[in-house]
A protein has these predicted regions:
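Long, low-complexity or tandemly repetitive, helically biased scaffold regions used
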Residues: 24-148
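Leu/Val/Ala/Ile-rich N-terminal alpha-helices, chiefly Sec-type signal peptides and the beginnings
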Residues: 1-34
Length: 148
C-alpha cells in the first residue's frame, strides 16, 4: 500500500527510535556479559573462552543490527510500508538470534557455575522485536489515510 511521503517519513522516524532503543539494550547486554566473563578468577579458563565465543556471537549480531539501522537511516524516502517491513524483518531476525545467544550464555554460565547469582542484564534480558510496533504504526497510518 502506498501513502503520502510525509506520513511514511513520520512512520520511518518512529521506527528509527524503536530500533535505537533495541540497539541500546543489546549494547548493555553485551557489556554486562563482558563484565561477567572478566570476573572469572581463573582468568583464561576454557569456561571463559567458551563464554567469550558466545559473547562474540552476540556482539556480531549487535553489529548486524547496527548495520541494518544504518541502512534504514540512509533509505530516507520509502515508497511503501512494505519496504519498511523488509527492514523490520531483517532486524527482528537478528534480535531473535541475539535472544537465543543470550539464553545460550545463561545456560552455559549455569552449567559452569551453578551456585552463583549473575547480573540479570547479562543473562535474562530479552530484547523485544520491532514487528509489533511496526504493525501498530502501519494500522494507524491506514486508519488515518482512510479517514482523511
Amino acid at each position: 500500500m502506498y501513502f503520502d511521503k510525509s506520513k511514511l517519513q513520520k512512520m520511518s522516524d518512529e521506527i528509527t527510535l524503536t530500533l535505537n532503543e533495541r540497539i541500546d539494550k543489546m549494547e548493555l547486554v553485551v557489556k554486562a556479559q563482558s563484565i561477567l566473563i572478566g570476573q572469572d578468577e581463573r582468568g583464561n579458563s576454557y569456561q571463559s573462552n567458551i563464554l567469550r565465543l558466545i559473547n562474540d556471537m552476540a556482539r556480531g549480531l549487535l553489529n548486524q543490527c547496527q548495520s541494518t539501522m544504518h541502512s534504514h537511516r540512509v533509505q530516507r524516502n520509502y515508497r511503501s510500508t512494505e519496504s519498511i517491513a523488509w527492514t523490520i524483518e531483517e532486524f527482528d531476525n537478528y534480535i531473535e538470534s541475539f535472544n537465543t545467544t543470550t539464553k545460550l550464555f545463561r545456560d552455559t554460565l549455569e552449567r559452569f557455575w551453578p551456585t552463583r547469582n549473575f547480573e540479570p542484564m547479562a543473562t535474562e534480558a530479552k530484547i523485544s522485536t520491532v514487528r509489533v510496533r511496526f504493525e501498530y504504526l502501519r494500522d494507524e497510518l491506514i486508519k488515518t489515510s482512510q479517514a482523511g
